[in-house]
Each structure stands twice: as C-alpha cells, then as structure tokens.
C-alpha cells in the first residue's frame, strides 16, 4: 500500500490542473485524488470503529452499486480540495495513518464496511489489498488521461485481486437464479472457486470441487477487466483470458454477473 500510494502521489504531483477530466470517467483528476484520500481515511476510521463521517451518506438500500455511489458522491463534498499537488500529500498522509492504525492488527481481523452493505465486512488484509488496488487502478485512470506510463506488474495485480469483494459486488439483476461453479486461475497467482447458488456468490479455495467453467487469465488483464477498465474481448482474442470445462460458454457471462468493485 505504501509503495502504491507513493506512486500515485508522484503522479498527482506531476499534474498542474485538478479540473482536467479523467478519461472514461465523469470525474476530474482532483475528484479522483479526493476519492483516494477519503477511501484511505474512511477505512482507517472503520478500523477504529468509527462510522460517523460516512453514515449520513449511506442510503436505505442493500444494492451495492447504489450504496457506494451515494457514499462516494457524499464524501467527495467533505473534501473540497482539488489541487493535485496538495492531494498528493494528503494521499501519503492518509496511507500512513491507515498503516499506523492497522500495524498491530491481525490480517484476518474483521473490519465492518457498511458503505458496501449493512452486514458487509472485510478482513484487515483484504482492506489493505483493496486500498492498494484503488491506488493502482485510479492511478491507471489518471495516467491514461495524461499519457503517462503506468505499468502494472503481475505481482501487484495478483496481490490486489479483490477476492473478498466478489460476494459483495454481485449484480442481483444479472445473477438472479444463477447456479454454477467457476474456477479462476490467475496465471502465476492464486486458483480459487467462485460458487454461485441461486444468484448468491461465495469464494472458496480450489480443492477439487466440481467445476462448470474454468477461467485462466493473465492477472493484469484480469484486474483491468474486473475493474471495468478494459473489455474482456481484447484479452480473449490474445489468449490472455481463456475458458474451458463442462460449460465453457459461461465464461463469457462471468464479468456481467458483477458490478465493478
């Protein structure tokens, strides 16, 4: 997380205009920076059991996308700063605060995340990986906007794959009634099973379950597809995203079963 935040801060420092529209987004560079700051601050507060800042913006719905959209819009108003150079320092400060408050916590300790769902939670390790992933993926967005190189290593992509988020980000409209087992092979990384039972997803270690569809993916492409930054069709055409098994056609549907995390 520290390395990812440092990288994002360096990128923000290099951009003079916080009002620059981010490519493929409704946000500006300044708004993306503010979002990254609050993400770090909000989870640091959650680790300490405080939800006072975020609670007023949580709507009365259990739909992940609606809750997160409302909370994100509301919390952006709490941080009016949009100058990239100032936000760069705030990102570093907020990352350090999060690392400080979690330094003595076990990686499997649970932290509540009510902005995702009333009963939603992540492990401490999962929260840290999620925040690192946010730095990488939103840094990618900003870098694309200013034509700045932003290489993502296989190791980084493997570490920040948001496995704990998978059950939370199921799209109830597209997953309704769906029952199937998918085994995902992140090349050079983990193998895990996503089990759907009547539209409800769970993530399990791969241990010989009956599998309907195997998916093999380059971790970087998988990360960008999962976060909705690229279409699945390019990696499929290049052999970097493959499906096989008893029902290989289910692979084409897999991404659409989820909201972007």
Roles of regions detected by a PLM:
Residues 1-4, 87-90, 94, 127, ...:
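Amphipathic alpha-helix face/heptad-repeat signature
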Residues 157-198:
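A glycine-rich beta-turn/hairpin centered on an aromatic-Pro dipeptide
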Residues 207-261:
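C-terminal interaction segments
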Residues 4-11, 39, 94-97, 101-104, ...:
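Amphipathic, well-ordered alpha-helical segments in soluble domains
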Residues 1-22:
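Short, Lys/Arg-rich amphipathic segments at extreme N-termini
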């Amino acid at each position: 997380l520290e390395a990812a935040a440092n990288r994002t801060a360096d990128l923000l420092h290099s951009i003079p205009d916080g009002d620059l529209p981010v490519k493929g987004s409704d946000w500006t560079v300044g708004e993306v920076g503010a979002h990254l700051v609050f993400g770090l601050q909000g989870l640091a507060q959650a680790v300490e059991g405080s939800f006072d800042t975020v609670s007023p913006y949580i709507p009365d719905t259990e739909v992940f996308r609606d809750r997160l959209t409302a909370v994100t819009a509301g919390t952006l108003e709490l941080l009016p700063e949009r100058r990239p150079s100032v936000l760069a320092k705030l990102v570093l400060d907020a990352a350090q605060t999060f690392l400080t408050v979690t330094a003595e916590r076990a990686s499997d300790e649970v932290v509540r995340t009510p902005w995702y769902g009333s009963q939603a939670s992540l492990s401490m390790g999962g929260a840290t990986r999620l925040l690192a992933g946010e730095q990488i993926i939103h840094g990618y967005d900003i870098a694309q906007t200013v034509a700045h190189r932003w290489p993502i290593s296989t190791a980084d992509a493997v570490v920040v794959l948001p496995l704990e988020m998978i059950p939370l980000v199921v799209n109830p409209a597209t997953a309704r009634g769906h029952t199937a087992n998918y085994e995902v092979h992140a090349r050079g990384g983990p193998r895990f099973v996503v089990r759907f039972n009547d539209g409800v997803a769970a993530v399990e270690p791969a241990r010989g379950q009956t599998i309907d569809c195997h998916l093999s993916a380059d971790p970087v492409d998988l990360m960008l597809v999962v976060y909705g930054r690229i279409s699945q069709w390019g990696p499929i055409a290049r052999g970097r995203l493959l499906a096989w098994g008893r029902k290989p056609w289910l692979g084409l549907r897999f991404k659409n079963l989820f909201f972007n995390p």
